[in-house]
């Protein structure tokens, strides 16, 4: 590799590091001050940049949120869609989803709680992510309905149950903080807590745990 090529690689790496720092600092500001309360000059200052330099990496504040929403919603939506098509107990599949989503949020380098406030997904600029969020919610509701059909879950309103699941996950992150990789057992704790309230037979929890964890491992390995 020539000196010129090495220089280009170094600049590229620094650019990626700066972009990542902007995303991290933006997410923290959105969680603290909200989307509308955060100005691009605030983001630039937090990231150690001059405001014009920020726009070299992101053309707008919306572009930053787009990337954070993509991180927040894309993997969980895809994973939940796969679970809907899997066979086996719906309770175990729901357990696998809750564990996956909790781990996804807890291991995030970003504080994702702020981008799910301020009614952002109701804004026309974020319609793509509103649709993605709706699809994810529908997948969760389908799992719940499948649990009604196979008798593994109590016959609760699927919409209410889905909102409770989503709300518990987000509020858990607000409580424990993001970058919670050190919170060992958190995904299992949250999944256990939720399933205890949804199972038609609470005594089936150990079997649901075993099946759900095996399914989670298999699907994550295949990602």
What are these regions (language model features)?
Residues 95, 141, 158-166:
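Short, well-structured alpha-helical segments
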Residues 21, 25, 29-63, 67:
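Helix-turn-helix
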Residues 70-77:
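Short, basic, alpha-helical segments at the C-terminal edge of helix-turn-helix-like DNA-binding modules
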């Amino acid at each position: 590799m020539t000196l010129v090529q090495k220089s280009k690689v170094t600049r590229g790496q620094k650019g990626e590091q700066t972009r990542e720092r902007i995303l991290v600092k933006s997410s923290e500001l959105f969680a603290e001050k909200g989307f509308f309360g955060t100005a691009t000059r605030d983001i630039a200052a937090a990231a150690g940049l001059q405001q014009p330099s920020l726009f070299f990496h992101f053309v707008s504040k919306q572009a930053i949120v787009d990337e954070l929403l993509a991180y927040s919603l894309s993997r969980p939506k895809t994973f939940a869609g796969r679970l809907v098509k899997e066979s086996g107990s719906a309770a175990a599949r729901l357990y696998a989803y809750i564990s996956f989503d909790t781990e996804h949020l807890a291991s995030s380098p970003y504080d994702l709680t702020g981008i799910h406030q301020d009614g952002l997904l109701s804004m026309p600029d974020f319609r793509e992510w509103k649709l993605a969020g709706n699809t994810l919610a529908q997948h969760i509701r389908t799992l719940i309905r499948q649990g009604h059909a196979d008798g593994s879950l109590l016959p609760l309103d699927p919409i209410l149950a889905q909102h409770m699941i989503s709300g518990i996950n987000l509020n858990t992150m607000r409580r424990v903080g993001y970058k919670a990789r050190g919170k060992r057992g958190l995904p299992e704790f949250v999944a256990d807590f939720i399933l205890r309230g949804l199972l038609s037979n609470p005594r089936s929890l150990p079997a649901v745990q075993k099946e759900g964890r095996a399914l989670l491992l298999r699907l994550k390995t295949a990602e």
